[in-house]
Swiss-Prot record:
Organism, as annotated: Salmonella typhi
Keyword Acyltransferase: no
Residues holding O-phospho-L-threonine: H8, G9, N32, N157, R323, R337
Protein name in UniProt: Threonine-phosphate decarboxylase
Free-text function comment from the UniProt entry: Decarboxylates L-threonine-O-3-phosphate to yield (R)-1-amino-2-propanol O-2-phosphate, the precursor for the linkage between the nucleotide loop and the corrin ring in cobalamin.
Gene Ontology terms: biological process: cobalamin biosynthetic process
Length: 364
């Protein structure tokens, strides 16, 4: 039975209420946020410009869109910022209004919600445990002329796996030939060093929509900032007109402008994930009764080999919150997602997992 009402991670208020403690007493591994925290440059800019909240934001977000355009080396007219990438998901779904769409499971729940709101027929393509939850070329056969849209999360959430570029290109080519809009959710791609995603390929592929997030990499989930990118200026302009005015607050827009210039922060994050991610993965693999999938983002998918062990409940008693994946289509109560955090925080989770799993054998 689910512990919480929320369908997402990061629900520390409800988890803390279950324990009868303050939320700041809980160590949260359920939300995939950069543990280095907000860049100092962003924090300083917000503090120095607090008076901007006394004015309406620029309705066109000119400076933010220019900063994003410089960052990706594309025209600003290709970009539409939103109140977190989740808004961009709903914006592109309502703007394209597909009649039939495929979403890959397990995957982010908001694709289905956004499509359901517009009455779209949803077909689910299930990743297989036998394939290590990796996307294979079998999906190409599911791309048929009656489809309007395909949602892909690259890297996938919750598996953290990134499909091979050759396969993604084959999918993009088939979608183009069949006039299918390909929506690529690249919310976590910034965590993968030197991985540019599909934005550089958009010029000749107006059927591809790339969704990005600044929330996770720059640790600003409370501000909310995401954006979509597409090379069809007219289509983006149409969505811009349909978007709610002032959907991005002034502080979030400023944070985005400043964060994108902080290359030192990017390098520091890559260094942390390269070192700590590998160490944490290896340490988890040494624990009994756990299967750990080698994701490339800042989180890992785990499977507990004992269905009667509720790791989320057990760890919560030690004031640690992890993400149960039982509500992901295609997964069940054996699966969990954990963020990769600082070395000290990861050690605390490892110690708690040892306490739960050590001494328990499959024969018990």
């Amino acid at each position: 039975m689910a512990l919480f009402n929320s369908a997402h991670g990061g629900n520390i208020r409800e988890a803390a209420t279950v324990l009868g403690i303050s939320p700041d007493q809980l160590l949260d591994f359920s939300a995939n946020i950069n543990p280095l925290g907000m860049p100092v440059s962003v924090k300083r800019a917000l503090i120095d410009n607090l008076d901007c909240i006394e004015r309406y934001p620029d309705a066109d977000y000119f400076h933010l869109h220019q900063a994003l355009a410089r960052h990706h080396q594309v025209p600003a007219s290709w970009i539409l910022a939103g109140n977190g990438e989740t808004e961009s998901i709903f914006t592109v779904a309502s703007g394209l209004k597909p009649r039939r769409a495929i979403i890959v499971t397990p995957g982010f729940a908001e694709y289905g919600r956004a499509l359901a709101q517009i009455g779209c027929e949803i077909r689910r393509w299930s990743l297989r445990e036998a394939d290590g939850w990796q996307l294979t070329d079998a999906i190409l056969e599911a791309l048929t002329p009656d489809l309007d849209c395909l949602f892909l999360c690259t890297p996938n959430n919750p598996t953290g796996l990134l499909p091979e570029r050759q396969l993604l290109q084959a999918i993009a080519d088939r979608c183009k030939s069949l006039n299918i809009n390909l929506i690529l959710d690249e919310a976590f791609i910034d965590f993968i060093p030197h991985e540019t995603g599909f934005i550089p390929a958009l010029k000749d592929n107006p059927h591809i929509w790339v969704l990005r997030s600044l929330t996770k990499f720059y640790a600003i989930p409370g501000l909310r900032l995401g954006y979509l990118v597409n090379s069809d200026d007219a289509a983006v302009a149409r969505m811009r007109r349909q978007q709610m005015p002032w959907s991005v607050n002034a502080l979030a827009a400023l944070a985005g402008e400043v964060a994108l210039q902080d290359s030192a922060w990017q390098q520091a994050t890559w260094h942390w994930l390269r070192e700590e991610g590998a160490r944490f993965y290896q340490a988890l693999c040494q624990l009994p009764l756990l299967t750990v999938y080698p994701g490339r983002a800042n989180y890992l998918l785990l499977r507990c080999e004992r269905e009667d062990i509720d790791l989320q409940r057990r760890l919560l008693t030690q004031r640690i919150l992890i993400r149960s994946c039982a509500n992901y289509p295609g997964l069940d109560s054996r699966y969990y997602r954990v963020a990769i955090r600082s070395a000290a925080q990861n050690e605390r989770l490892l110690a708690a997992l040892r306490n739960v799993l050590t001494g328990i054998t499959p024969a018990d």
